[in-house]
Amino acid sequence: MSATRGGPDQGPSQPQQRRIIRTQTAGNLGESFDSEVVPSSLVEIAPILRVANEVESSNPRVAYLCRFYAFEKAHRLDPTSSGRGVRQFKTALLQRLEREHDPTLMGRVKKSDAREMQSFYQHYYKKYIQALHNAADKADRAQLTKAYQTANVLFEVLKAVNLTQSIEVDREILEAQDKVAEKTQLYVPYNILPLDPDSANQAIMRYPEIQAAVLALRNTRGLPWPEGHKKKKDEDMLDWLQEMFGFQKDNVANQREHLILLLANVHIRQFPKPDQQPKLDDQALTEVMKKLFKNYKKWCKYLGRKSSLWLPTIQQEMQQRKLLYMALYLLIWGEAANLRFMPECLCYIYHHMAFELYGMLAGNVSPMTGENVKPAYGGEEDAFLRKVVTPIYEVIQMEAQRSKKGKSKHSQWRNYDDLNEYFWSVDCFRLGWPMRADADFFCLPVAVPNTEKDGDNSKPIVARDRWVGKVNFVEIRSFWHVFRSFDRMWSFYILCLQAMIIMAWDGGQPSSVFGADVFKKVLSVFITAAIMKLGQAVLDVILNFKAHQSMTLHVKLRYILKVFSAAAWVIILPVTYAYSWKDPPAFARTIKSWFGSAMHSPSLFIIAVVSYLSPNMLAGVMFLFPLLRRFLERSNYRIVMLMMWWSQPRLYVGRGMHESAFSLFKYTMFWVLLIATKLAFSYYIEIRPLVAPTQAIMKARVTNFQWHEFFPRAKNNIGVVIALWAPIILVYFMDSQIWYAIFSTLFGGIYGAFRRLGEIRTLGMLRSRFESLPGAFNDRLIPDGKNQQKKKGIRATLSHNFTEDKVPVNKEKEAARFAQLWNTIISSFREEDLISDREMDLLLVPYWADRDLDLIQWPPFLLASKIPIALDMAKDSNGKDRELKKRIESDTYMKCAVRECYASFKNIIKFVVQGNREKEVIEIIFAEVDKHIDTGDLIQEYKMSALPSLYDHFVKLIKYLLDNKEEDRDHVVILFQDMLEVVTRDIMMEDYNISSLVDSSHGGTWHGGMIPLEQQYQLFASSGAIRFPIEPVTEAWKEKIKRIYLLLTTKESAMDVPSNLEARRRISFFSNSLFMDMPMAPKVRNMLSFSVLTPYYTEEVLFSLRDLETPNEDGVSILFYLQKIFPDEWNNFLERVKCLSEEELKESDELEEELRLWASYRGQTLTRTVRGMMYYRKALELQAFLDMAMHEDLMEGYKAVELNSENNSRGERSLWAQCQAVADMKFTYVVSCQQYGIHKRSGDPRAQDILRLMTRYPSLRVAYIDEVEEPVKDKSKKGNQKVYYSVLVKVPKSTDHSTLAQNLDQVIYRIRLPGPAILGEGKPENQNHAIIFSRGEGLQTIDMNQDNYMEEALKMRNLLQEFLTKHDGVRHPSILGLREHIFTGSVSSLAWFMSNQETSFVTIGQRLLANPLRVRFHYGHPDVFDRLFHLTRGGVSKASKVINLSEDIFAGFNSTLREGNVTHHEYIQVGKGRDVGLNQISMFEAKIANGNGEQTLSRDIYRLGHRFDFFRMMSCYFTTVGFYFSTLITVLTVYIFLYGRLYLVLSGLEQGLSTQKGIRDNTPLQIALASQSFVQIGFLMALPMLMEIGLERGFRTALSEFVLMQLQLAPVFFTFSLGTKTHYYGRTLLHGGAKYRSTGRGFVVFHAKFADNYRLYSRSHFVKGLEMMLLLVVYQIFGSAYRGVLAYLLITISMWFMVGTWLFAPFLFNPSGFEWQKIVDDWTDWNKWINNIGGIGVPAEKSWESWWEEEQEHLRYSGKRGIVVEILLALRFFIYQYGLVYHLTITEKTKNFLVYGVSWLVIFLILFVMKTVSVGRRRFSASFQLMFRLIKGLIFMTFIAIIVILITLAHMTIQDIIVCILAFMPTGWGMLLIAQACKPVVHRAGFWGSVRTLARGYEIVMGLLLFTPVAFLAWFPFVSEFQTRMLFNQAFSRGLQISRILGGHRKDRSSRNKE
C-alpha cells in the first residue's frame, strides 16, 4: 500500500524523481512510482518494473533479477539510447542494479539465480493463483487479473535467467505457465463488463438484460469469415467486423461494451419486469437504431441517395443485420478521432462501408474481379485508421497549420465546419470509394512547409486553383456581420424610425398617418426597404465571395439574381412613387422631371408595393403555420425547392426549427408587447419632441464661426442636426436591450413564482412544512410501484399529507425510506464538515425504526426543548387534564415528543428490567398510568409536581446506559429504586394497590426479628433483576438511547440548527425543489443511463501541504485564509478527525491527507469536482437499495447492508453487490486528463494526486492522450516517430489490503490516434478524445471548477426522465439545462457582485430563454446532453481555432440548428466556482467578449438569424451577440455625444444658436443619455438580480442587498466591466486577436501591482478614459449653453463618473490599494518596468518595450481593411488641434487657414527638437558629456525665450498654454496610432525608434496622471480603512478578521518559523 502514502516532504519538489530512483528510499512514493517514470519509448518494460516493486518485500533477489531483465530489454529496445530520456533512465537503473547486486546476493536462499526464480515462481503460483481459484464465488477478479499478469512477467524473467545459465525449465512450471498464459488472454482489465467466460457469475453479468445483449451480439450464424480464420471461444459480430474492416482491437472491445450497455439499458426500459429468458427485444433495438441513424438517413435524403441500411426479410436475420449496422457505425465513430467533429464526413464513410457490409452479407460478386465483394481497404491490422481516417485527418491538420494558431484570416484556411460542409453537397461523392488521393478535398493551396511530416507519407501539394476553399460561408472580420445576420431586425427598426420621423415631422399625432399626404409619405418606407434589400444582397456577395469556388451554379445564380432584382426594385419603387403624387415633394419631383411629369397614377405604386411584398406573404403564412414551414423546408419536391430557393438557400442544417403553436404564441406576445412599448417610448419621448427644435435650428442662420469654416454657406445647419440626432438614433437602436432587461425580469419573475421557486426560503419555513416532507420525499424520489402518471401541480403536492402520528403498514416503509434518504443527506453534510457532531445528531432521523413505537420519529432538531417545556406545563397544570392536553396538542411536535418519550421510557424500562417480581410491579404501574391516560384523568389522579424529580433520575439512568460500564451497576440499581419511590410515593401518592404490591415484592418484615442477608430480597438488587451492562450493544440500541437523551436534555431551542449558512441554503433549496414539478422517479434499473465527462488540463488537483502552508507576499497561507473564511467548518473538521489543533494533525500521515482534502474541497480543484460527481454513484447505490430491498432489509436499513457487505458476504449475489452492479450499468464518470501520461512520466505530483482519486473512487475512469516514441515501421528509415494514443485507465478495487497489491493504474483501452489530437481550441478536442469512453444515453459535461451535492444527486433520475417527454409538443429535448449555484461569492464584494450577476443569468435569464423565448443554448457546463443525438451530430462542442473560442455555446447553436430542443430545469442545481479578483474577472469578461466577437462572424449565428422566425430571431440577437453590440453602442453614444458637443463648441455654432431650444434645453437628448447611463451603471444586470434574490430569498432581502451593493460601489464595477466588454468585443470584430485567456481559479485576496494593472487596462480603459476626460475638460472651458440645467448636470456627472471609473476602478478594487508602503513598492516596480529595454526573449512583464510591441500585435494580422479603419479612427484626435488653435488669445482676430498650418509647424518643430535630443543623447552623452549638456541647456533657454516673447508681445495667457497642451497632446497620440498601424512603412523609413520614444513619453505621462491621485489618497490612513471595509463587507458582516488575512500575520509566522 506504499503507493498511497506520501510523507510531508513529498510535495511539489517531485521532479527530482531521478534522484529518488538512485537512492534507496524504501517504502517511499518515489520507489513504487519509479515503474511509472519510464521514457515513452520504453513503455514495454514498465510492467516488469511494476512486478519488481511488487515482489521486493518478499524476495529482494527476484526483484533485482526483474530489474536486471528490464535493463536488458531496455537495451534491446533502444540500443543507441536515441529516445528522449532513455540514456538517463538506463544510467539510473544501472546504478541501482550495481548498488543492489551484493546485498541481494547475500540474501539469496537457493544456490543459483535460476533455482531462486523457479522456486519463487512456484511459490507465487500456489499462494496466489491456486488459492484465489479455490475461493470459488468470492474470487476477486481484479486480484486474479493482476496475479496472472504478474505470473506472466515472472515467467518471462525466469526464462531469460534460465537461458543465461543454460538450465532447462521444469515441466511442472511449463504446465503451470501454459494455464497462466491461457488465462491471461481471458483475464484482461475491463471497464464495466467482464466479458470473459469465468465472469458469468459476476453480479453485473447476471442481469437478464445484459445477458440478452451479449447473446444477441454473439449470434454470428451465416457470417462469411475470411479464409484461415482461427475460431475463438465467444466470438461475436464485432470480432467479424474487426477481421473484415481492420478496426483496432481495443476500439472493438470498447464499442462492444458500449453497445451491450446501450441495448441492455433500453431493453430494460421497454420491459420493466423482464422474463428470465434473456432475449433482446426488437423494439429496444429499433429505438437505438432510430436514434443512431436519424442523422445519417436525413443526410441520405438531403443528398437524394438511397441509404445503405438494407434489411433482410427473414426475421431471424433482421436482428443480426441491425446489430451489425449499429456496431459498424460505433466502430467507425470510436476510431474517427478528430473526424468526430465532422458528422457528415462520418456519414460519408459509413455510407460506403455499410454498403460493403451489405454486399458481403448478400454474397454479391464484384463485377471487376469476379470474386465476392471485399472491403475496399482490406481487413489487415489498423487498415481503417491508416487508410480511411489518417488521410482526412491530415487535411484537417494541414489546414490547422495554415491557420498559424489562429493568426491567419479565417478566409485563408478551412476549419472543421468547412471540411464537414464539403459533404453537404452531392459533389462529395466525387471523392470516390476508395477515396481518390487527387480529389479536390485533399488539395491545399500553395506549398505548405511540411516540417512535421516525414518525407514519404506527406501528400504532394497541389496548386491553388484546385483548393476547395471555404464552403457555404466565409468568416470575415467586419461589423457588417451584425447587420447581415440580423437584417430583418435592422430593417424593421430603420423603417419604423423613418415612419416615426415622417409622422412627427408632419403633425406629430399618430392619428395623422391616416391623412392622405402623411400616409403617402409614410409609404416611402418601402423605397428604403428596397434600398436596404439591395445593400443586403451586395453585402452577401462581397462577404461570401471567397466561398465561390465551392458554390454550385444555382447558388451563384441566386446571389446574382438577388442583386439584380433588388436593384430593379430600387428603380421601380421610387419611379412609381413619384407618379403617385399630383404635387410631389422635392425628392419625387426630381425623379418625375427625369421621366416626364405629365402622368399621375397612384395605383401603380400600390401595385408595385404589393408585388414587392409578395415573397414576404409566403414568409408570413409560414410563420403562422409552423407545420407547413417544417414540411416545405424538409421537402425534396422540385417545385417546393424552387419556391424555397428564392426565399432562403437550401442548407443541410437549420431546417424545420419551428415551435408548436402555443410556444409561438407565447414568445410572439412577449415581443409584440416589448416592441410596442419600445416604439411608443421612442416616439413620444425621444423623436417627436426633437422635431420642432430641429426645424427651428434648420431655419436659423449662423454667420459668426469661431474657426475656419469650410462650408460657410451650407444650408440647414446640417452639422448641428447630425450632432443632435446621432446620440438619439444610437440610443433608439440600443434601448431595446433595456426594455428586454425590464420585460425579462418581469416575465422571468412571474414564471419563477409559478414554478414554485422560493416557497421554502428559510429554516423557519422548512420547520413549518417538515410534516409534508416525508410525503414529498416518497412522492418525488421513490418510484411509484403502479407506474401510473401522477397529477402535477400545486394541489398534488399539498394534498400529500404526511402528518398522522400513527404509522400504518405501508407508511412504515415510507418512513424507513424517508429516514434512509434524509440521513444520507445529513451524513454528507457531516462528511463535508458543514455541521458538527451535535448538529448531526439533532438532524438525523432514526435509521432503525423502533417498531414498538407506533409513531413517526421526527428529527430531534424539531423536538428539541419540547420535553422540558411540557414538563413545566404539566407541573403547573393543577389537575386540569383537558387544558393541558389542548396546550400540548396545539404544537404537533410537542405532542410527538411527549408520546415518543413516554413510549421510549416504557420500552427502555421494560427492556432493562428482567426479574419476574420487578416486571410484575412495573407492568402494574404502567397499566394503571395507561388506564388514566385513556380516561383522561391522569392529572386529576396523580400529583405532577414530582415529575421533574422522576425526569432527573431517568436522565441519569440514560447517561449510565450510554456509558454502559460494569462498575456503574450498583448506581443503576439505586436509581431504579429511587425512581420507583418517586413514582409510588410522590406521584401516585401512596396508591394502596401499588404500595401493597411493592411491599409484598420486598418480602416485608412481618414476623419481627432480623432476616439473614442472603434471604433479604430488595427489588432490582438481585443478580438477574436488571440487565446491565447491556450485552451486546447493537447500533439500533445506541441510536435509541442517544436520541432519547437528546430529547430529554436539549434545553435550548434548536432554531439555529444547522448554523452553517451553506448547509441552510442547501437544505432549504432541496426541500423546496421537492415541491416543484418534476418527472416521477423510475426505478434505478429502468432509468436512463448517463455519463459525466470532465475535461482537465493542468489545474490544481489536490493542494499539497507545501501549497497550503507557503505564505504569499502578505504572509497569508492558503490554509490560514481558509481557516479564517470557514471558521465553523474548520472546527467541525477538527472534531471529525478528533484533533484539537493543527499541530496534532501533522503528526500522522493519514490526518495530513485529510487536511489536504479539507482544503482542496474549499478551492476550485479537481478533487472537489470528482467528489461532487461521485455523489451520483452513491445516490444510485442507495436508490437501488431502496428499490430492491425486501421489507426486512428495508427496516434494517442501507447502513446495515453496507456494514454486512464489508464484514462477510462479499458474494456477487449479495444485495450490496447487486446495488453496485446497477450503479455501474447506469453511471460512468470519465475525467479527460489530457496530460496525465506526460505528468506520470515526469513524476509530476499531479499524476499521483489523480491516482489517489482513482484509488479513492474505484469507478472513476481517467482518459488521457499518450504520446509514445516508437521505432518507425518502415525498415529503410531509422529513428523514432511519435505515436499518439487515446488511453483509458482505472485503479482496480482492492478488497484485501494485506496482499502485495500496490495501487497502480491499469490500462483498459488503448486506441491509436492518427496524430496529435489537439489541433483547435484544445478543450473541445480534450472532450472529444475521451467521449468514446463515455456510456449511456445522457452525457453531462462538467467543468473542473464545479461541484455537486449528495441531495441534488438524488434527483438525477427524475431529471433524465425529461428526455422522454416532449416539452414543446414538437420534439424531445436534446439538452437539459440545469441551474448553477456560484459558490465563490463569499468573501470580497467583487466576488459577490460577480456571483450575483452570474446567478441571475443562470437562473432567471436562462429560465426565460428556455421558455417562453425558446432560444436557450448551451452556456457551459452542467447541462445534460442527449448523448446519442450529439455523438451523431458532431459532439458536445466545436473545436475550430479562434472562431469557436467560446466552444460550449456552439454546441447549443449546433443542437438548435439540427432540430434539437434545449430546456431549462430549476429543481436541480450544480455548484460552480467563479473568478474573484478584478483582474481575473476582467480576463474572464475579455474572454467572453472575444468569444462573442467571434460568434458575430460565425456561420451558426448567421444561420440562426436567418432561419428563426422574426421574433425568435429577436430573442436570439438580444441574448447572444446583441447584448455585446448594445454595450458597444452605449459607449459609442457617449463618444458621439461628446464629439458632437466638441464640434458645436469649437465651431462657434453653439454660441450662435444658443437661443434655440434644441441647444439650450434638449429633453429628448437628456432622456437618451439617461438611458445610456442606465446601461452604464449596470441597470441591465441589477434588475434580474433583484428579481431573482427577491423570488428566492424574499424581497426585503433583495432590497437590502441592492442598497448594500450601491454602497459597495457596484455601479463602479459594472461601469468598468462595460469598458472591458466594449474594448474586447470591438477589437475582435475589427482585428481578431481573440485568444483563450486562462482565468484564475485561486483565492484572491492579494494586492495587484500598479504595473500589472497598467498593462491589463491601459488600452481598454485608461486611454479611453483620458480621451473622454479631455473632451469633458474642453467642453467645461469653452461650452456655455446650459450650465445651470439640472438634467445637464446629472448627465455631466454620469460622464465624469464613467471617466473616473475607467481610470481608477482597478485601484479602488485592489486590496491594500491605498496602503502607503505598497504604493511606494508599486512606484519603484513601475519605474523599473517602463525604463527596461525590450527585445527578443524579454517578457512583457519585465519591460515596457516588449509589452508595447505585443499590445499592437493584432494590427499585424488585421489585414488592409482593419488598418484603414484604425487610421480613420485615429483621425478624430486631429479635431482638437484644428478647433483649439482658433481659440487662443493670440489668434482671436483671424480665422485664416494659415493658423492651422502654423500649428503643424510648431508640432514638427517640437518633434524635431525631441529627435535632436535623443540623437544627442546617443552620440554625445557617453564621450562628450559637456557638449550634450550644452545642447540641452541651449534648447531649454530658447524655449523659455519664445514663451516670454509670446506672452509680452502677443498677449499669450496661462489659459493659452493649457489650451496648447490640450490641442497638441491628442495630435501626437493620433500620429502615434497611425504610425503603429503603418508599422512596416515607418520601419522602412527608419522612424520606428522615434515612434517608440514618443510612445514611452506618453505612457509615462499617463502613468503619472493615474498614479498621483492614488498616492495622494494613500497619505490618509482612513482611506485604506474605508477601502478594506468596502471591499470585504461580506466578511465583516460574518465576523471574519479580514484585517488579519490582508495584513497577514507576519509576526506570528516569523516566530513559528524560528521555532
UniProtKB/Swiss-Prot annotation:
Listed InterPro entries: FKS1-like_dom1, Glyco_trans_48_dom, Vta1/CALS_N, Vta1/CALS_N_sf
Protein's name in the database: Callose synthase 3
Pfam families reported for this sequence: FKS1_dom1, Glucan_synthase, Vta1
EC number: 2.4.1.34
Membrane topology recorded in Swiss-Prot or TrEMBL: Multi-pass membrane protein
Keyword line: Cell membrane, Cell shape, Cell wall biogenesis/degradation, Glycosyltransferase, Membrane, Transferase, Transmembrane, Transmembrane helix
Top-level EC class as recorded in UniProt: transferase
Location within or outside the cell: Cell membrane
Function: Involved in callose synthesis at the forming cell plate during cytokinesis. During plant growth and development, callose is found as a transitory component of the cell plate in dividing cells, is a major component of pollen mother cell walls and pollen tubes, and is found as a structural component of plasmodesmatal canals.
Protein family according to the UniProt entry: Belongs to the glycosyltransferase 48 family.
Entries under SMART domains matching the protein: FKS1_dom1 (SM01205)
Transmembrane domains' residue ranges: 489-509, 522-542, 559-579, 605-625, 661-681, 718-738, 1518-1538, 1567-1587, 1598-1618, 1662-1682, 1689-1709, 1762-1782, 1793-1813, 1834-1854, 1857-1877, 1900-1920
Origin: domain of life: Eukaryota
Entry GO CC: 1,3-beta-D-glucan synthase complex; plasma membrane
Record topological domains on the Cytoplasmic side: 1-488, 543-558, 626-660, 739-1517, 1588-1597, 1683-1688, 1783-1792, 1855-1856, 1921-1955
Molecular-function GO terms, alphabetical: 1,3-beta-D-glucan synthase activity
GO biological process, any: regulation of cell shape
Extracellular side: 510-521, 580-604, 682-717, 1539-1566, 1619-1661, 1710-1761, 1814-1833, 1878-1899
Catalysed reactions, as listed in the record: [(1->3)-beta-D-glucosyl](n) + UDP-alpha-D-glucose = [(1->3)-beta-D-glucosyl](n+1) + UDP + H(+)
